[in-house]
C-alpha cells in the first residue's frame, strides 16, 4: 500500500464517523417536529410580520403543514417582542380570540390577513422592515417549534411580493 493510499484510508474513517454523527443529528431534529410514528409531522413555513402601522400592535402570519397521519392542535404562540401574543380569527368583520386551533392530518393551517393571525400586543420595541421576530409555537401533541419571522413592508402579501 502506498503512502497516498494509506492517507486516504485513515482520513476516510473519521469522515465516515462524522457523516454518521451528522445524519443522526439531522434525524433527531426532524423527529422533534413529530409526536412519533403515526403521529403528526409538522413543518412551519412562510412566517412574516407586516411592519405595523401603529406602535401598539402587530400581527404575525405563517403556515403549518402536517404531513403525518394524526391531527394536532396549535395551543399557543409566544414572541420575543411582545409579552402578549394571542391567536385570533377574523371573519365577516369580526375578530375572536382562540385558545387552540386544529392542524389537520395531511393538511395545512394557514395564518393570513383576513383569517387566522397572531396578535402581538404592545411590542417592546419598534418593528421596522428588515427586523426579525422570533415566534415559538406550542402544540398539544408535537414539540414546540421556533421560527424567525422577518418584518416585511405594510401590505406585504407573500403570493404577490416574492
What are these regions, as identified by a protein language model?
Residues 34-162:
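Compact, glycine-rich, soluble single-domain proteins
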